[in-house]
Amino acid sequence: MFNINSTLSRRNFLAGAAALGSTVALAGCSSGGSEGGSADDGKTFKTGVIGPLTGAAATYGVSAEKGAKLAAKDFSTKDLKLSLKSEDDVADGEKAINAFNTLCDWGMQALVGPVTTGAAVAVSGEIADDMLMVTPSASSLDVTKDKTTVFQVCFTDPTMGASAAKFLAEKYADAKIALFYNSGDTYSSGVADAFAEQAKESKLDIVDTETFKDDSSTSFTNQLTKAKEAGATLIFAPIYYTPASVLLKNAKDMGYDMTLMGTDGMDGLLSVEGFDTSLAEGVLLMTPFSADDEKNADFVKAYKDAYDETPNQFAADAYDCVHAIAEAIDKAGIDITADGADIADDLAKAMRKIKIEGLTGELTWNDEGQVEKPATAYVIQDGKYIAA
């Protein structure tokens, strides 16, 4: 097993969605007390969940919602009831702001999400310091930059890219590598930039770099042809599971035998509708969670019992978000009926002090709100994630 402790860079990767120029006004979201936050019983803490529940990225949002619901049940006590309400943002920044406003009207006191990076950047860029925001999977440094109450459970782009390059330097030092990424996506390009930087330092042999601009692309034959002609034996592609499934099918159709390596966004590849999962055999990916790991057996069983499916990393990340919020509430010793700004400030201070044994590892947070936890590489074998 390859295990790297996170050391977080301060490189500033720009989030394209942050510049979406939203004209939607973000409502103030002070909660608690007379402003409608905690329920009248004084024990209910209202937590919002924002993510794509419909659309191309729905797997991420729906999984996160399910994981958060399980955690709310597990971490509620006789003195603290964690109440959840979800809103769909279709992985869109402007819709995420609308969802945030809707949850504010409900009386939200803390936010799990948004799930995708662009939406999270949009909300965190507008959010005042009167709301604790813990995103399960948004990875850009811009999500938490200059924010006092915003935290990430997912690795940052620099951490993920550098970790992947270090793994390849240790395990695949002789590989001829093609770098393949979505230049129009904040997450994909951010990880790719960090990978390229660390690859140079680690003296990896990158023989080709190919890009695309749309996750709905139906063919990568041109890019794969160039990678094959360059002699690439391994493709590092920090892309989402849908384009990854297309890439693997295209490679098979053209007789290109190579190893594909992805990152956490590729988790979900085995569940793509109509995808021949045998094509995923031997795929490498960096992810903090494996449903096949014995230490996660209780969670996996509870998830399967509740939803009749196997949890992915996004479900585990969201579970850890709610776990962290519950731990922060306990650590801060707050009165959940107090003013929302006071709650957020106290919870943010507590978040920087707590350490939780989460599903995705041992989690702590630095002053910038970025998570520090180990990154692990897995290989897909017979439909299971095996430590690489």
Task: Locate the predicted segments by residue.
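Extracytoplasmic "Venus flytrap"
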Residues: 48-67, 87-94, 116, 180-190, ...
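Beta-alpha junction/loop-to-helix N-cap segments that form part of ligand/metal-binding clefts
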Residues: 38, 60-66, 74-144, 153, ...
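Segments of small-molecule ligand-sensing domains
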Residues: 306-315, 326-387
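An alpha-beta-alpha
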Residues: 150-211, 234
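Extracellular/periplasmic periplasmic-binding protein-like sensory domains
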Residues: 248-319
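Hydrophobic alpha-helical segments within soluble ligand-binding/sensing domains
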Residues: 96, 153-176, 189-191, 217-221, ...
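N-terminal secretory signal peptides
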Residues: 1-8, 16-26
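Bacterial lipoprotein signal-peptidase II cleavage site
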Residues: 27-39
